[in-house]
């Protein structure tokens, strides 16, 4: 199954493969709501034999308790590469850093401080050894918050305003971005990159998850279909999570009608525009209206199945590349 993979993503991936040296650091940002689905085998290959930090962003929308977060940390330790570090961020922590001038280190959220310290550790040794330039490439799928993380780090480190464009829609960054200094007096720079999707969906449910968390542009899937999946997940968790919009139901048409009534969004003659109200419900989900929960299964068996699918995809791509070279 194909996914949203416009030309600039393919170009970006090729440029990254040509640009990232063994001394550089990869910061991969993932959406904590889909910690498994937002893994990208193409980025895994890019990070092989390089220092890498995996940042789970938007944790406030995913984890109601610290226990769930610890479980993600533990599962993430099943890495195929030598140096992988895990950090977690919430939306409010990056926003908090950007909204005020960080005059002292005590004003910086703890997670940002930890991430800065980790990047210092990973970059300073190589820099000191040869005074070479070290780049920190910030990568990940669309709309996981790469630019926000990058801006928060730079603002906390150098007390400067944001340098990367931030948007609420996937695909805001379309080219390998401007190289900006990360630490004062050091040749350590961050590079913003466009979000890169998988050219092929590994599991059918992934496409709906991507649409739900806005990793894909709205309209790629019908909004009502995405809300139908959301309703299914909410019913599994607790139907009381949406009682402000509707009484408990398994029928998405009934849910959308009730939501339109409760929010005053009925059209003329009491009609319901399913697409319009579905779009509104999706916006509510993306702001945490229904609470914090993870869309991916957190069971280790599911992680192992995912890793197997990723390996098969990588092998197919490698065979395709070899076949193309032989024909050339």
Swiss-Prot record:
Recorded GO MF terms: GTP binding; GTPase activity
CP-type G domain segment(s): 10-199
One Gene Ontology BP term is: mitochondrial translation
Q: Which Cys pairs does UniProt list as disulfide-bonded?
A: none
The highest taxon in the source lineage is: Eukaryota
Identify the keywords attached in UniProt to this record, alphabetized. Answer: GTP-binding, Membrane, Mitochondrion, Mitochondrion inner membrane, Nucleotide-binding, Transit peptide
Q: Per its database record, what is this protein's job?
A: Mitochondrial GTPase involved in assembly of the large ribosomal subunit. Plays a role in expression of the mitochondrial translational machinery.
Q: What is the lineage of its organism?
A: Eukaryota, Fungi, Dikarya, Ascomycota, Taphrinomycotina
Topological type in the membrane? Peripheral membrane protein
Q: Where is it chiefly localized?
A: mitochondrion
Please give one Pfam family short name: MMR_HSR1
Q: Does the keyword Phosphoprotein apply?
A: no
GO cellular component: a single term: mitochondrion
Name used for this protein in its record? Mitochondrial GTPase 1
Cell compartments where the protein resides: Mitochondrion inner membrane
Q: Which family does it belong to?
A: Belongs to the TRAFAC class YlqF/YawG GTPase family. MTG1 subfamily.
């Amino acid at each position: 199954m194909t996914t949203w993979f416009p030309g600039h993503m393919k170009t970006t991936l090729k440029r990254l493969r040509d640009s990232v040296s063994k001394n550089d650091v990869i910061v991969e940002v993932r959406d904590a709501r889909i910690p498994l689905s937002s893994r990208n085998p193409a980025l895994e290959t890019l990070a092989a034999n390089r220092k890498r930090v995996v940042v789970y962003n938007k944790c406030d929308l995913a984890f109601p308790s610290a226990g769930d977060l610890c479980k993600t940390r533990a599962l993430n330790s099943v890495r195929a590469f030598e140096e992988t570090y895990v950090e977690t961020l919430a939306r409010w922590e990056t926003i908090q850093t950007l909204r005020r001038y960080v005059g002292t280190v005590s004003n910086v959220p703890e997670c940002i401080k930890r991430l800065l310290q980790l990047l210092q550790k990973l970059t300073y040794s190589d820099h000191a050894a040869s005074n070479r330039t070290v780049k920190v490439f910030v990568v990940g799928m669309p709309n996981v918050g790469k630019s926000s993380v990058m801006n928060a780090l730079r603002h906390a480190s150098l007390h400067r305003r944001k340098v990367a464009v931030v948007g609420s829609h996937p695909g805001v960054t379309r080219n390998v971005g401007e190289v900006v200094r990360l630490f004062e007096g050091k040749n350590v720079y961050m590079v913003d990159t466009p979000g890169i999707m998988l050219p092929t969906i590994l599991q059918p449910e992934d496409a709906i998850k991507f649409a739900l968390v806005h990793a894909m542009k709205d309209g790629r899937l019908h909004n009502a279909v995405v809300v139908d999946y959301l309703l299914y997940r909410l019913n599994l968790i607790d139907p009381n999570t949406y009682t402000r919009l509707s009484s408990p139901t398994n029928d998405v048409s009934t849910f959308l009608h009730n939501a339109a009534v409760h929010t005053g969004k009925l059209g003329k003659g009491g009609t319901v525009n399913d697409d319009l109200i579905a779009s509104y419900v999706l916006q509510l989900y993306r702001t945490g209206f229904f609470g914090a929960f993870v869309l991916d299964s957190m069971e280790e068996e599911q992680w192992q199945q995912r890793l197997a699918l990723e390996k098969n995809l990588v092998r197919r791509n490698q065979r395709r590349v070899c076949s193309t070279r032989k024909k050339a």
